[in-house]
Amino acid sequence: MVDRRRVGDREAFSGVHRPHDDVDPSIPRSDVSLLREHLAGCLDVWSADSGTFRALLGKADGEAIPDTCENLWLRASGADPWQYDVILMDTTPTTWTFKRDDRISLPIDSILWTRDGIDYLRPEVQLLHKANSLRPKDRDDFAVCLPLLHAPARQWLKNALEVAHPGHTWLVEL
């Protein structure tokens, strides 16, 4: 699943150009060993856990990822820049749960949208993830996406923000 991907030079959802330092795919946490097997010999995999990066050098199925680890970072070698920030999602076969607040969940089939055969994380779900830090690029993404969100997506984001981030600045605009 890809949560943010360029189509040509443009964002898949908004059609707006915005430079990216990396690509942020999302995978279910349960698929980490499959990802590591697939990338073996191509990209180094590092766990990002509470601000600490740790190279995952062992066999894909032999090294557990702590439950507190939210992301894997990938690059060709320790001397190369990061290429991918892989977001680990908490899922069951039927349900996605927001990693920062387990009171927020959705049926797994409703967190994605598809364009040209590629699955993307729905923009309202991506914006919920971005709401935590409010970097300038996250505020820009919100401003660009907000007018494009359908009423149910806006309402879902508003409800989720009220639960996870009461008083968030985006609530006024939603």
Model-inferred region functions:
Residues 1-174:
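Compositionally biased terminal segments of proteins
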